[in-house]
């Protein structure tokens, strides 16, 4: 072999090693240049008793991810209201190699160690609907203090001159849900000093059965003639409350949230006054877009995180807070029907046909 040939072979080998080093270096950078079919996202939702999660949130998020990254792998988990189960599910998602977690925390505080574990593994976390503690990368939800304010204002409006003629009962959400604390604070900011609160409860796990028992206890303690209204933090609780009120022969203003189908029907029937619609699709689409950007190694654009919030553990988190809407019997068609949550046919079953006709919904 000539010296010239040896030199050519040596140069070719060096070039190959150099290219290999560059390729290895590029692979070592999480998310850098990642293609759509390499995107792996874990979706962790908290429970299924509230109808929104399986009917709306999950399919909307999954559809948007597939639209933005057609080859994406989506690993879905539902914690069934168990904080321990959700922590185990985070471990599973990390073991599967998910690059981003969309996390709706069962317990915002106890999940902090799992969020930290994800950060340590180089995995990004998008907090969805509830702001988990720990080093979260982005957050999307509704203005939850505003939700409580709207509920409180609607209750006051429905009470009218009866506001100071008796007492109201407040049934707040789960003490482990940071959103519940914000709803509660927002409602109190409106109601305090304008009504007398006879009984107030926090309701573990947002459980309608607990709400039913609490309401029955409040009726027994206060007397049914003393209760002029009920603040309910969401529609699931309102379902349990409405049953207790009906059993006691009471029909007073009752709030809610989430625009569940049964709540819309109670509004038509006159056993619930309002609910709060938080259109799920804009929230789900935003979370999906955040997650895909992070999985592909991109920065989330400012349009998706125009503000910053502070979590319970003190982290400053880029966020998008959407605007909630009050739904009453007069605007059902312009809200939940127009937004595609339900069709008139779904709402106006035979049991509610007369009420629908009276409100012009048919």
Summary of predicted features, one role per range:
Residues 2-11, 17-362:
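A residue-level marker of the well-folded mature domains of exported/periplasmic proteins
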């Amino acid at each position: 072999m000539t010296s010239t040939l040896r030199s050519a072979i040596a140069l070719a080998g060096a070039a190959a090693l150099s290219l290999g080093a560059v390729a290895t270096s590029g692979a070592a950078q999480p998310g850098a240049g990642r293609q759509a079919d390499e995107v792996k996202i874990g979706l962790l939702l908290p429970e299924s008793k509230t109808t929104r999660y399986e009917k709306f949130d999950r399919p909307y998020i999954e559809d948007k991810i597939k639209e933005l990254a057609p080859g994406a792998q989506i690993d879905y988990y539902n914690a069934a209201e168990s904080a321990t189960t959700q922590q185990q599910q985070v471990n599973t998602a990390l073991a599967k190699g998910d690059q981003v977690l969309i996390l709706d925390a069962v317990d915002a505080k106890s999940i902090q160690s799992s969020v930290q574990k994800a950060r340590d593994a180089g995995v990004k976390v998008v907090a969805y609907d509830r702001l988990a503690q720990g080093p979260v990368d982005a957050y999307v939800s509704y203005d939850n203090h505003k939700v409580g304010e709207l509920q409180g204002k609607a209750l006051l409006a429905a009470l009218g001159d009866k506001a100071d003629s008796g007492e109201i009962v407040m049934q707040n959400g789960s003490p482990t849900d940071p959103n519940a604390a914000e709803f509660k604070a927002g409602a109190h900011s409106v109601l305090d000093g304008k009504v007398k609160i006879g009984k107030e409860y926090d309701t573990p796990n947002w459980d309608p059965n607990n709400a039913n028992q609490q309401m029955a206890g409040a009726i027994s303690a206060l007397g049914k003639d003393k209760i002029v209204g009920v603040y309910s933090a969401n529609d699931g609780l309102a379902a349990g409350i409405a049953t207790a009120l009906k059993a006691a022969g009471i029909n007073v203003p009752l709030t809610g949230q989430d625009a569940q189908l049964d709540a819309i029907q109670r509004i038509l029937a006159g056993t619930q006054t309002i609910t709060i619609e938080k259109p799920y699709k804009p929230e789900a689409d935003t979370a999906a877009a955040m997650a895909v950007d992070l999985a592909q190694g991109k920065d989330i654009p400012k349009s998706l995180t125009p503000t910053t919030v502070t979590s319970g553990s003190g982290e400053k988190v880029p966020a998008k807070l959407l605007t909630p809407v009050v739904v009453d019997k007069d605007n059902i068609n312009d809200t939940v029907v127009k937004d595609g949550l339900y069709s008139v046919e779904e709402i106006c079953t035979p049991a509610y046909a007369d009420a629908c006709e009276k409100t012009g919904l048919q």
